[in-house]
């Protein structure tokens, strides 16, 4: 079973949200602590007439890492170059990127945890010394050449900070964790997006979409566009709670923002493994999904909601998950039975 594409927090190849992206820190909604810290670092760098220190954004997908990287370049008044870890296969690929940067430019590397080790080795002196060490030739005649680079800011983004090597992670002077959004923050994101899309949305309609957006602005934007489709076909000039609820139910997105894959994940633990604990590899095999998909896409929001707990022995359902599924936790039933047995005269 494939995940509902509406609830996939990964970016689409042709990103329809591009026109909705905020273009400044003032327009950016949410991530208040991170946003205000970035504002301070930018102002300080501009006062000293220096390039901003290297920045690492980490956290679940869809929370604004790419957008913030673009905003940094815009606020600093410099150029912006973007690439991703899997694209940079050889050290020469990275060297070509670095040598084409202008002074002060921002180089954004998405999925930076997927850089090849040989590429990382080239990146270390570039980040620390603004220099590129290259080997020219082969064999006994090979020699090392150092090329000076312009001042630049590397902005890395990752959903798996733990997979970054320690030497690379330590070279980022500004590590920034991005958190899931609150319902109120998502309501503001949706209201702003609706205005830019030229559609009218009632506060309660925006809130209904926000509640089912998994704490992720990217998902909120997708759901908003699909709800707009239902509203247009129904002839409704305004998206209210009824229209939003009807559309999202038909899209099989429930009140907590869970889709069929999420519910299948929870039901597998509840039904087959009696609430757990159960190992990640076992779950991935049962769902016919890669381990990384389960760990990076399905689980973070379920854990954030308190539906699932990661324990040393595996994944385990919490009480909220049983209630959401409309089932009784067998461990609670066993506990009550034990209490009755221990009371004289009752059994």
From Swiss-Prot:
GO biological process: DNA recombination; DNA repair
Organism: Zymomonas mobilis subsp. mobilis (strain ATCC 31821 / ZM4 / CP4)
One Pfam family this sequence matches: RuvB_C
Family per similarity comment: Belongs to the RuvB family.
Region annotation Large ATPase domain (RuvB-L): where it falls in the sequence: 1-181
Annotated GO CC locations: cytoplasm; Holliday junction resolvase complex
Tagged with keyword Lipoprotein: no
Biological role: The RuvA-RuvB-RuvC complex processes Holliday junction (HJ) DNA during genetic recombination and DNA repair, while the RuvA-RuvB complex plays an important role in the rescue of blocked DNA replication forks via replication fork reversal (RFR). RuvA specifically binds to HJ cruciform DNA, conferring on it an open structure. The RuvB hexamer acts as an ATP-dependent pump, pulling dsDNA into and through the RuvAB complex. RuvB forms 2 homohexamers on either side of HJ DNA bound by 1 or 2 RuvA tetramers; 4 subunits per hexamer contact DNA at a time.
Annotated region (Head domain (RuvB-H)), positions in chain: 255-347
SMART domains recorded: AAA
Stretches for region Small ATPAse domain (RuvB-S): 182-252
Key words of the record: ATP-binding, Cytoplasm, DNA damage, DNA recombination, DNA repair, DNA-binding, Hydrolase, Nucleotide-binding
Binding site for ATP: 20-21, 62, 65-67, 171, 181, 218
Name this polypeptide is given: Holliday junction branch migration complex subunit RuvB
Lineage of origin: Bacteria, Pseudomonadati, Pseudomonadota, Alphaproteobacteria, Sphingomonadales
Residues where Mg(2+) binds: 66
Domain free text: Has 3 domains, the large (RuvB-L) and small ATPase (RuvB-S) domains and the C-terminal head (RuvB-H) domain. The head domain binds DNA, while the ATPase domains jointly bind ATP, ADP or are empty depending on the state of the subunit in the translocation cycle. During a single DNA translocation step the structure of each domain remains the same, but their relative positions change.
Main location: cytoplasm
